[in-house]
A protein has these predicted regions:
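Conserved nucleotide-binding/hydrolysis modules and their immediate coupling elements
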Residues: 208-311, 319-323, 487, 496-546, ...
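Short glycine/threonine-rich beta-strand-turn micro-motifs
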Residues: 168, 352-367
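Canonical P-loop GTPase G-domain recognition
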Residues: 124, 134-194
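Helix N-cap motif at beta-to-alpha junctions
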Residues: 230-232, 282-283, 362-368, 412-415, ...
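P-loop NTPase switch module centered on the Walker A-proximal segment
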Residues: 1-105, 145, 214-217
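A short, contiguous, amphipathic alpha-helix enriched in charged residues
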Residues: 241, 318-341, 556, 560
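Long insertion/accessory domains within large nucleic-acid-processing enzymes
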Residues: 259, 264-267, 400, 446, ...
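Interdomain boundary/hinge elements
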Residues: 39-43, 127, 153-165, 199-210, ...
Length: 609
C-alpha cells in the first residue's frame, strides 16, 4: 500500500446559499489559477445558466488548485437532496469533505442529507463556518448544533473531533479565530492538507478506475469521469470495462484529461488517486470499472436511493401545438428523456400504454422541474401532469408512502397558521423552539403528498417571511386522504385573444393569471376560482359598439395586475384533471379535456361508477 502525499481529493458540502461556490472562487483566485489579466465571472463553479439564476448547484463539478507542491482536487456537490444521485457518486471520488455552514443559519436539512451520506462512507470532515462577518452570526452555537447533529448521525470518534475554520468567502479570508476580519485563505488550505487523508492504494498494481460521472461532447462522444483507485493509466492503453450487468468489454483509452483550475488539461498518464476524464470507451455508464485486462476486478458501486415522485411527460396536443417549439414529436421527447437517464442515475423513464406519453420518476419536485426547464430552453414543447408520489407495498401487503422531514423557520406570529395548515396535511411535529431573534424553529414529519402544493400556500400564510426545507425520510404506512387544492379554476370559454373588457368581467370571478392581448384556447386555465368548482369565463369578449351615445363618458376599465405563475407554481397549482403545457416561450395551464361538454360527460360517468 502506498500514499500520495502531494494530492488531496475533497468535496464541499453546503446548503443552498451558504456560500459554497463563492468560497471556491476565492480558493481559485488565491491559489493563482487565474492570470492577473483574466476576466473571471462571479460564482465560476455554477457554469449552467439555471444554476446561476437560481443560485443552486445541480450538477457536481470538479476543479483543482495547487497549494505549494500539493494538488487539491475540489468537487462541488449539489446542496439539495433532489439531486442526491449526484451526491452519492461524488463522495466515492474523495477522501474528505469540507462542511460549509452559515454562521447565522446553522446546519440545514439538505446539508444533513449529504453529511449523513459522507459520514456513512467514513469521510473525515473539516468544518468551515462561513459568513462569519454576517450580522447575527452565532459561531459557537452553530458548532454545538453541529456536534449534536454528528452524534445523531452516528459519527465515529475521529469524525467527532473535527477541526473548525471561520471564514468569509465574500471577503476572502479564513482563520482559526472567529473574531478575525482580515487575512487570506491560507488557514483553510493548511487544514485541508492536515486533516484530509492523502489517497492510499497500490500505485504499481493492476489498473482500476471507478467511473462516477459521465459527460458528453459532440466531438469526442461520451467522457467518463472517475478516480484511479489502483495503478496508473496512460493514453492508448487497452482496458477491460466491467459493466453493471456483470458483462465485460474491451476498449482503448482515447484521450486522458486531468483538472487544472476549471478546465480539463490533456495528459499522457495519471496515477493512484487522480481524478481523470477519459474518452474512447463506447457505451460507458456510471458505476462501471475500467480494469487491466489481465486482472478483471469490478469495484462495488454505491446504492442510489430510489425515486419518490413521478410525472407523465406527453406530446402537446393543445390547439397551439407546434407553434413555439422546435422539438415536438414523441420521438424527440423520448430520445431526450432516455438521454437524460444516461447521466442522471437517480431518474427513471418508463414507456406507457400510449406512444406519446412517458412516465418520468425522480427524487423530488425540484429535480423534475429542473429537467422540464432545461428541456424547455433546449427548444422542446410538451405537456406534463401533476406530480404523484410513488407508493410501495410493505412486507405484510400494506401500502407505504414516502415521508419527509420538514424544517420551518418563521416569525412567532405565524406559528399558529403554519401548524394548522400542516395538521390538515397529516404532519406530526417532532421538534419546536424559539431563538432570541423571535424566529421559531419547527420540525415536522409529513407525507410527501402533504407537501405538494403547500410551498405557495406557505409563502402566502407567512407573507413571504418563512423559510421551509424538506428532506426524504423513508417510507411509512399510508396516512389516509389529504385534502388537495379546494379552489377551482377559471377556464376559457372560446379560443381567441384576451381583451380588457373580457378580463374586467372575469376578474370579479377570481384571481387572473393572464393580462390583455394573450392568445388563449377553449379549456385553457386563466385564473383561480374562489369556489370549489371550475368557472367558465369569456376573457375574449369585446364591448359591442353601438351608434347610441351614452349620456356620460365611458369609464376607463381598471384591471387588477395578473399573477404570473412560474413553472414550479404551475406544477403546484394543477389538479389531477389538469396539465401544464410547456413551450420555449410560454407556460400554460389547461384542462386535460378541453371541451366543457366532454368534461361534464366525463364527470357524470365518474359519479355513476
Amino acid at each position: 500500500m502506498g500514499t500520495r502525499e502531494n494530492l488531496r481529493n475533497v468535496a464541499i458540502i453546503a446548503h443552498v446559499d451558504h456560500g459554497k461556490t463563492t468560497l471556491v472562487d476565492q480558493l481559485l483566485r488565491q491559489s493563482g489559477i487565474f492570470r492577473a489579466n483574466e476576466q473571471v465571472a462571479e460564482r465560476v463553479m455554477d457554469s449552467n445558466d439555471l444554476e446561476r439564476e437560481r443560485g443552486i448547484t445541480i450538477l457536481s463539478k470538479n476543479t483543482a488548485v495547487m497549494y505549494g507542491d500539493t494538488k487539491i482536487n475540489i468537487v462541488d456537490t449539489p446542496g439539495h437532496a433532489d439531486f442526491g444521485g449526484e451526491v452519492e457518486r461524488i463522495l466515492l471520488m474523495v477522501d474528505g469533505v469540507l462542511l460549509l455552514v452559515d454562521a447565522f443559519e446553522g446546519c440545514m436539512p439538505q446539508t444533513r442529507f449529504v453529511l449523513k451520506k459522507a459520514l456513512g462512507l467514513g469521510k473525515r470532515p473539516v468544518v468551515v463556518i462561513n459568513k462569519i462577518d454576517r450580522d447575527g452570526a452565532r459561531p459557537y452555537e452553530v458548532i454545538d448544533e453541529l456536534l449534536d447533529l454528528f452524534i445523531e448521525l452516528d459519527a465515529d470518534e475521529d469524525q467527532l473531533d473535527f477541526p473548525v475554520i471561520f471564514a468569509s468567502g465574500r471577503d476572502g479570508y479564513a482563520s482559526l479565530d472567529p473574531d478575525a476580519r482580515e487575512g487570506d485563505m491560507r488557514p483553510l488550505f493548511e487544514a485541508i492538507l492536515e486533516h484530509v487523508p492523502a489517497p492510499q492504494g497500490d500505485p504499481d498494481g493492476p489498473l482500476q478506475i471507478l467511473f462516477s460521472n459521465i459527460d458528453y461532447d459532440d466531438y469526442t462522444g461520451r467522457i467518463g469521469v472517475g478516480r484511479v483507485e489502483r495503478g496508473r493509466v496512460r493514453t492508448g492503453q487497452t482496458i477491460t470495462l466491467c459493466k453493471r450487468d456483470g458483462t465485460t468489454q474491451n476498449a482503448r483509452i482515447g484521450k486522458l484529461y486531468q483538472f487544472e483550475g476549471l478546465r480539463r488539461a490533456e495528459c499522457e498518464t495519471a496515477s493512484l488517486g487522480d481524478l481523470v476524464s477519459v474518452t474512447g470507451i463506447p457505451d460507458l455508464n456510471i458505476g462501471e470499472t475500467a480494469c487491466d485486462p489481465e486482472h478483471v476486478e469490478a469495484l462495488p458501486f454505491v446504492h442510489i436511493d430510489e425515486p419518490t415522485i413521478s410525472m407523465i411527460f406527453m406530446v402537446n396536443n393543445s390547439p397551439f401545438a407546434g407553434r413555439e417549439g422546435k422539438y415536438v414529436t414523441s420521438r424527440n421527447i423520448r430520445d431526450r428523456l432516455f438521454k437524460e437517464i444516461e447521466t442522471n442515475v437517480s431518474m427513471r423513464v418508463e414507456e406507457t400504454d400510449t406512444t406519446d406519453a412517458f412516465k418520468v420518476s425522480g427524487r423530488g419536485e425540484l429535480s423534475l422541474s429542473i429537467l422540464i426547464e432545461t428541456m424547455r430552453r433546449q427548444g422542446f414543447e410538451f405537456a406534463v401532469s401533476r406530480p404523484q408520489v410513488i407508493l410501495k407495498t410493505g412486507p405484510n401487503g400494506e401500502t407505504l408512502e414516502p415521508m419527509e422531514l420538514l424544517v420551518i423557520e418563521v416569525p412567532e406570529q405565524y406559528v399558529g397558521v403554519v401548524m394548522e395548515r400542516l395538521g390538515s396535511r397529516k404532519a406530526e411535529i417532532v421538534n419546536m423552539g424559539t431563538r432570541d431573534t423571535g424566529i421559531s424553529h419547527l420540525e415536522f414529519r409529513i407525507p410527501s403528498r402533504g407537501l405538494m402544493g403547500y410551498r405557495q400556500q406557505f409563502l402566502t400564510d407567512t407573507n413571504g417571511n418563512g423559510i421551509m426545507n424538506s428532506l426524504f425520510d423513508g417510507y411509512e404506512p399510508y396516512k389516509g386522504e389529504i385534502p388537495q387544492r379546494v379552489q377551482g379554476s377559471l377556464v376559457v370559454h372560446e379560443t381567441g385573444e384576451t381583451c380588457a373588457y373580457g378580463l374586467w368581467g372575469a376578474q370579479d370571478r377570481g384571481a387572473l393569471f393572464v393580462g390583455p392581448g394573450i392568445p388563449v384556447y377553449e379549456g385553457m386555465i386563466v385564473g383561480q376560482s374562489p369556489r370549489d368548482e371550475d368557472i367558465v369565463v369569456n376573457v375574449c369578449k369585446k364591448k359591442h359598439v353601438t351608434n347610441t351615445r351614452a349620456s356620460g363618458s365611458d369609464e376607463a376599465l381598471r384591471l387588477v395586475p395578473p399573477t404570473i405563475l412560474s413553472l414550479e407554481q404551475s406544477l403546484e397549482f394543477i389538479n389531477d384533471d389538469e396539465l401544464v403545457e410547456v413551450t420555449p416561450e410560454s407556460i400554460r395551464l389547461r384542462k386535460r379535456i378541453l371541451s366543457k361538454e366532454l368534461r361534464l360527460k366525463a364527470e357524470s360517468r365518474k359519479k355513476q361508477k
